[in-house]
Structures are given as structure tokens and as C-alpha cells.
Curated annotation (Swiss-Prot):
Gene3D superfamilies: Vaccinia Virus protein VP39. One of its GO terms (molecular function) is rRNA (uridine-2'-O-)-methyltransferase activity. CDD domains: AdoMet_MTases. S-adenosyl-L-methionine binds at residues 71, 73, 91, 107, 132. This is Ribosomal RNA large subunit methyltransferase E. It is found in: Cytoplasm. One of its GO terms (cellular component) is cytoplasm.
Length: 217
């Protein structure tokens, strides 16, 4: 449920920074690789690298993917869990269907959407919760970081509802004033909590991925 790239988000005139971003994007190695492999975005390589290091997602698992659009994480996850596994995805934005992925469109900040997602899970526990959610960015850290942390905290609350004991959680976090507090909260719930900065994450970006394993239940 990527609050990212929302069609109603703030519109900015073409600036030097946006032109630089576009130049880097079209010349980006990971963008080219994703296009060549028929994947929906370069973000897939972040999850692939994290999973290679931490071995979180395996055949037969059930995975919840929050902030799923345009779908590259769900694509990768459903291929990895195979026919005996399950992927349930959610995003505020529409997402083209992916075979084997149960997709719910809605705003994860709304109780009705969370309840609908829980209904899709149908009382079963899941092995991994993924969250690549991000708010519409204004460029003002004092606004963007709290909005981002709110989504991170909602994803952690979802873990408490649905994760199997010893389950795992991967969440995108933007470094800022509330980061240490979130890490402290995550450590109360998981045996191991670490940060990852995948090679495919742009170096200028303040994003990191928190990888939490061994859910205490």
C-alpha cells in the first residue's frame, strides 16, 4: 500500500533536482535490469538482496506485502513461496493482477481496510510481513518523517495481529528523530532487529530497511 506516488500528491514544477532524478532513473543499472527481466520496479532488488542475506522467505510460506504497488515485491515473493505458499498484498494505489497474489486496494491507515486485510488472512498466521509503504513526500523532513513513522508503526501493529511465532518483518524506514524509539519498540517484539541498506537503494536516500526476525508472539 504504497502511499508513494499517489495521484493526488503534491505537484512540483520541473526543477534541477527532478531533472537530475529523471536522468539518473533512465540510466540506472537496476532500472535497466528490472526492465530486462520483466519486473515491475527496481525495488525488487532490495528485497532480493535482503532475503539473500537474511533468508526470510522460503517455499510454502505465507507473506503479507504492504505498500505493494506496482508489485515487484509481490512478484518476487509469489515466485519464491511457490504453489504451496500464499501472498496477500495491499496498496492505496491500483495494481495490475499477479497470478497467485491476493490483492486488496485500500488505505492501510483506515480500520475498514485493515479489517478487510485480516479477513483475507482468515485467522491464519503469516510467516513474513513486508512493508515498503511510504507517504507522499513534501521534501520537508519535519513533515515527511513523522508521516513515514506512522506507517511503520501501523505495520508493526499488523505484525502483532498476524505473525506466527518466530516470524519475520521487513519495513522501510526513513532515518530521523523517531528512528531509535521505533527500534526499541521492535526489539520488544523480535529477538533480532537490524538495519540493511541494500546496494540497490540510492545512496542519497535516507531510507533503510529494518529486518526483524524471531517474533516473540
Amino acid at each position: 500500500m504504497a502511499q508513494k506516488d499517489h495521484p493526488n500528491g503534491p505537484k512540483k514544477s520541473a526543477s534541477a533536482s527532478s531533472k537530475r532524478w529523471m536522468y539518473e532513473h533512465v540510466n540506472d543499472f537496476y532500472v535497466k535490469e528490472a526492465t530486462k527481466k520483466g519486473l515491475r520496479s527496481r525495488a525488487v532488488f532490495k528485497l532480493e538482496e535482503i532475503n539473500k542475506k537474511d533468508k526470510l522467505i522460503r517455499s510454502g510460506m505465507t507473506v503479507v506485502d504492504l505498500g505493494a504497488a506496482p508489485g515487484s515485491w509481490s512478484q518476487w515473493a509469489v515466485d519464491t513461496v511457490g504453489l504451496k505458499g500464499k501472498v496477500i498484498a495491499c496498496d492505496i494505489l491500483p495494481m495490475d493482477s499477479i497470478a497467485g497474489v491476493d490483492f486488496l486496494q485500500g488505505d492501510f491507515r483506515e480500520d475498514a481496510v485493515v479489517n478487510a486485510l485480516l479477513a483475507r488472512i482468515a485467522g491464519h498466521k503469516v510467516d513474513v510481513v513486508l512493508s515498503d509503504m511510504s507517504p507522499n513526500m513534501t521534501g520537508t523532513v519535519g513533515i515527511d518523517q513523522p508521516k513515514s513513522m506512522y506507517l511503520v508503526e501501523l505495520a508493526l501493529e499488523m505484525c502483532k495481529e498476524v505473525l506466527v511465532k518466530e516470524g519475520s518483518f521487513v519495513v522501510k524506514v526513513f532515518m530521523g528523530s523517531e528512528f531509535d524509539l521505533f527500534m526499541s519498540e521492535a526489539r520488544k517484539c523480535f529477538k533480532s532487529v537490524k538495519t540493511r541498506k541494500p546496494d540497490s537503494s540510492r545512496s542519497r536516500s535516507r531510507e533503510v530497511y529494518v529486518v526483524a526476525t524471531g517474533y516473540k508472539g
